[in-house]
Amino acid sequence: MLAHLNSLLVSAKLVFSVGGAREGAKLLSFDRQVAEIVMTKQDVSMVGFGRRTSVHAAWQWVQTHCETLSSEISSLETAAGRVLAEDIMSDCNVPGFARAMMDGFAALATDIGGATDFSPVQLKLVGEAWPGQPINRAVQQGEAVQVMTGAPMPAGADVVVPVEMAERLEQPGKPDETVRVSASLPAGKHVGNIGEDIAVGQKVLPRGRRLRPQDLGVLSSIGFPQVPVVKRPKVRLCLTGNELLPAGSHPEKYRITDANSPLLRPLIQRDGGDCLFDGITPDDPDAILEVLQQPADVILVSGGSSVGAEDYAPQLIQKWGELPIHGISMR
């Protein structure tokens, strides 16, 4: 559920309430009332849920009442898991040059047409090209250049013969070396063309995408040291209950240890939110109201959200705002 809020802005506070297994999850809000759901202003305590809303209708309400958060700039080092605020368009080709896709020999396809194991073609070796180190001459008819994978293609060459299909020959007493080619390959074979991976003007990543580590590699390859991302929603955790002991405490008679905040806090962080949590809130309406009125984009209430005598959260929201949804039909 939290993942769906990662790229949303709550125009007014949203309050989500997490109940037990029997109760399911409850969705509460200070914001405008959804048209399909009608609630009276009666006290909801000790009378049962007036109606249970379907999960689909609840999500529709959330999507209707949320807008995109404002954006900020993030460096690539901190952008993993963030949500893109804009489409990313490439202003360059990747690669920006034709390159060899195999270790072998760059040559002219017309020179090796018809070459076989039984009838090889010999070419004059005129140099070498390495990644980042091109050869400063063009390949002429009857010539070849040894290339490594990723090396810029020499001018004039239009095919790379893999080392498995060629043999470099050194002839004693002769300064010139030759290459014996035993395969016929078409022009363009084993050659990476300009813009083959990413072309100028291409939409590389869409707005709203949650960035993965591999996306950051793509962004770096097109020269983006930083990217516009949606601000993280501030999610305030309101954990209520007089019976609760701090997380990690040993259970005592008639009291239980907080097991929800250790679960919810990392879930909020995992799904893109910044968790705000000031500790356990007692079952006191004034104390709960104080938490609900603190600045936040989303408030997640755990406990005190059903229809019991001390379930104050629904009453407070109904009194100080609106309660469009109270009770969701789910297990």
Protein language model regions, located:
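Short, low-complexity N-terminal leaders and the immediately following helix N-cap/first helix
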Residues: 16, 30-117
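Residue-identity detector for glycine
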Residues: 19-20, 24, 104
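Short, glycine/charged-enriched hinge/interface segments at domain edges or termini
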Residues: 40-53, 106-282
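Short Gly/Pro-enriched turn/cap motifs at secondary-structure boundaries
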Residues: 95-98, 193-194, 328
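Short glycine/threonine-rich loop/turn motifs
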Residues: 255, 261, 270-331
